[in-house]
Curated annotation (Swiss-Prot):
NCBIfam families: uS13_bact. GO terms for biological process: translation. The keyword RNA-binding applies. Located at the top of the head of the 30S subunit, it contacts several helices of the 16S rRNA. In the 70S ribosome it contacts the 23S rRNA (bridge B1a) and protein L5 of the 50S subunit (bridge B1b), connecting the 2 subunits; these bridges are implicated in subunit movement. Contacts the tRNAs in the A and P-sites. GO terms for cellular component: cytosol; small ribosomal subunit. Residues 106-121 have a biased composition (Basic residues). It comes from Streptococcus pyogenes serotype M1. GO terms for molecular function: rRNA binding; structural constituent of ribosome; tRNA binding. Belongs to the universal ribosomal protein uS13 family. This is Small ribosomal subunit protein uS13. The keyword tRNA-binding applies. Residues 96-121 are annotated as: Disordered.
Length: 121
């Protein structure tokens, strides 16, 4: 397994797919990285030369991925909560942030339904 940005990427998959195992790299970014490094998308990770691996590492190092990206996202959410914006309040309360209805759904964000005693008749 090749190690890129602290993540072991699978050997038997194509490089374009294997790079998506790194947090912050999707399919589009993966294709851009390979184009900049001059590597074919169809080649498998196990068939990469050490020079090609180094070229991929250099391209990935120029992008914010893994821990740095997670930290930045968390800091952005924390900033929204501190300034007291609507989005920050929704984050703090554990409710949907992007305007979804909460009367019936939003179970993923709100958690398991809690029964209220004395509600049934």
């Amino acid at each position: 397994m090749a190690r890129i940005a602290g993540v072991d990427i699978p050997n038997d998959k194509r490089v374009v797919i294997s790079l998506t195992y790194v947090y912050g790299i999707g399919l589009a970014t993966s294709k851009k990285i390979l184009a900049a490094a001059g590597i074919s998308e169809d080649i498998r990770v196990k068939d990469l030369t050490s020079d090609q691996e180094d070229a991929i590492r250099r391209e990935v190092d120029a992008i914010k991925v893994e821990g740095d990206l997670r930290r930045e996202v968390n800091m952005n959410i924390k900033r929204l909560m501190e300034i007291g914006s609507y989005r920050g309040i929704r984050h703090r309360r554990g409710l949907p942030v992007r305007g979804q209805n909460t009367k019936n759904n939003a179970r993923t964000r709100k958690g398991k339904a809690v029964a209220i005693a004395g509600k049934k008749k």
